[in-house]
Design a protein with these regions (language model features):
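Acidic, Ser/Thr/Pro
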Residues: 1-156
């Protein structure tokens, strides 16, 4: 597949918002693959996260005050809180899909023979494509993400 574009960015801890990338598809396409990758979904191991920093985060974000003997609650926070990023796309201002499975790499694939879960097959793969990164929670500073769009041009 031909790479139409690839963008990369870093998200700060606590960021909530949307980032939209818009591009005109250069030709009618037979296949479209929109991919998003990110990392730092969960806190690293307990020995890499300062205890006071984790307690402060739990109090600030969730209103939970953790004492010295709250090992179970701290373990729960450490292993269950996550960075949550979804991916949505429109083609010619019509919704064609949104994926939010908790994977570090996600693909939205559109073709005559293949369609990703959470997507709607458009009548035609041509026109203005908008890809929106929907960010609901970022745990750690400098969380990297990457969005790429690959196409197969329709043969004439």
């Amino acid at each position: 597949m031909e790479e139409l574009y690839k963008v990369k960015g870093l998200l700060n801890a606590g960021f909530v918002g949307q980032i939209t990338y818009t591009v005109c598809l250069p030709a009618k396409c037979s296949k479209l693959d929109i991919c998003m990758k990110f990392s730092k979904q969960h806190f690293p191991s307990a020995d890499l996260v300062p205890l006071e920093e984790l307690k402060e985060f739990c109090k600030k974000e969730y209103g939970i005050s953790l004492g010295e003997n709250d090992d179970e609650a701290l373990d729960n926070c450490l292993h269950n809180m996550k960075t949550e990023i979804h991916l949505m796309a429109t083609l010619n201002y019509e919704f064609i899909g949104c994926i939010h499975k908790q994977k570090l790499e996600r693909h939205m694939i559109f073709s005559a023979s293949e369609l990703s879960e959470g997507c709607v097959r458009p009548d035609s793969l041509e026109g203005v494509l908008k890809v929106t990164v929907l960010v609901f929670n970022v745990l750690m500073d400098e969380t990297p993400y990457e969005v790429s769009v690959h196409i197969n041009r329709e043969e004439k």
